Swiss-Prot record:
Pathway: Lipid metabolism; phospholipid metabolism. This is Phosphate acyltransferase. One of its GO terms (biological process) is fatty acid biosynthetic process. Catalyzes the reversible formation of acyl-phosphate (acyl-PO(4)) from acyl-[acyl-carrier-protein] (acyl-ACP). This enzyme utilizes acyl-ACP as fatty acyl donor, but not acyl-CoA. Its main location: cytoplasm. It comes from Pediococcus pentosaceus (strain ATCC 25745 / CCUG 21536 / LMG 10740 / 183-1w). It catalyses: a fatty acyl-[ACP] + phosphate = an acyl phosphate + holo-[ACP].
Length: 347
């Protein structure tokens, strides 16, 4: 197995990316890592080059670059060369902690969509505080600002395969993020999406879910549009950090007794922080393209990079992309007919 790594992408690149690759090698002895970036800078942090190949390039897509322009103009950047390697069959997957928009564009324009799928979705794994499973998957969390009901249905299919193949959940419970649990809640798109999900016998659809219930283990896969999903994701992250900060400040401002109590609760706080750390699950996955595309947080450290690379290995090993491609190929005619029927309804 070969994983193409954008060694220059991210706030802490290349140091934390290279160190993360070094850690991942210990867990993944069957993987060859192809690092794209400035060879002399990569060499500073690589103790040895066992199972590692470096492809030198001086060009880098920065966080400030406009995504589509960067993909078109920076042909020799570390991210684009890594994506081209996947397209050409020289690597099985791509990993980057760099510019999210540019990676999405590279996934769409270079690696390409699975035939029969209208729009890919960005998928992330979040912790469940209670329920049958420790985590749940949510998509879309940023690939599409606007979505049609059909897209939300497709996201449910993508999430169902991800839950089954990668998360190893049997018959994942799928819920639609909405402003109420009743079937008739939401706008026209969500009402239509509800019916599509309800009528798809291949999905274990459990109905609508409100955002306040997301972490309570109600569903294994939560479906939403990219704008809402991204806002919810950042809200969860921000709320968790703010609450921990508030508790810490309250303890420190309550004198000796408060500090002693905080010391006694230190282990409990560490457990809570560990449970809420979704970076342990790896990165966000662009589902619906012809090869695994995994995006880690820009501020990822070496351990988080390692976790994401282990996740990439799991995705490739599970043959998730092939299973998705086979599904949409098998249902291509019915998808085309649904599109024709929808167009006739609108005329």
């Amino acid at each position: 197995m070969k994983i193409a790594v954008d060694a220059m992408g991210g706030d802490n690149a290349p140091e934390e990316i290279v160190k993360g690759v070094s850690e991942a090698r210990k867990a993944l002895p069957d993987v060859e890592f192809i690092l794209y970036g400035k060879k002399d800078e990569i060499a500073k942090y690589m103790d040895d080059f066992r199972n590692v190949k470096v492809v030198h390039t001086d060009e880098v897509i920065t966080m400030e670059d406009e995504p589509v322009k960067a993909v078109r103009r920076k042909k020799n950047s570390s991210m684009i060369l890594a994506a081209q390697a996947v397209k050409n069959g020289d690597a099985d997957a791509i990993f980057s902690a760099g510019n999210t928009g540019a990676l999405l564009a590279a996934g769409l324009f270079i690696i390409g969509r699975i035939k029969g799928l209208d729009r890919p979705g960005m998928t992330t794994t979040l912790p469940s505080l209670k329920g049958e499973n420790d985590n749940f998957t949510m998509l879309d969390v940023g690939a599409n600002a606007e979505s049609k009901a059909k897209n939300l249905h497709d996201f449910a299919i993508l999430g169902n395969f991800y839950g089954t193949n990668v998360m190893h959940v049997t018959n994942p419970r799928i819920a639609l993020l909405n402003n109420g649990t009743e079937y008739d809640k939401g706008d026209k798109i969500h009402k239509e999406a509800y019916q599509l999900l309800k009528n798809d016998s291949s999905l274990n659809f459990v109905g609508n879910i409100e955002s306040r219930e997301l972490l309570n283990g109600t569903a294994d896969v939560v479906v939403t549009d990219g704008f809402t999903g991204n806002a919810v994701l950042k809200n969860i992250e921000g709320t968790a950090l703010s609450m921990l900060k508030l508790v810490k400040e309250t303890i420190m401002n309550n004198g000796v007794k408060g500090k002693m109590g905080g010391l006694l609760l230190k282990s409990a706080f560490s457990q809570i922080k560990d449970q809420m750390d979704y970076s342990k699950q790896g990165g966000a996955v662009l589902l619906g393209v012809k090869a695994p595309v995994v995006k880690a947080h820009g501020s990822s450290n070496a351990n988080q990079v390692k976790n994401a690379l282990v996740q990439v290995h799991e995705i490739v090993d599970s043959k998730l992309v092939k299973n998705l491609a086979d599904y949409f190929e098998m249902h291509l005619e019915s998808i085309k007919q649904d599109d024709v029927d929808k167009e006739n309804e609108n005329n």
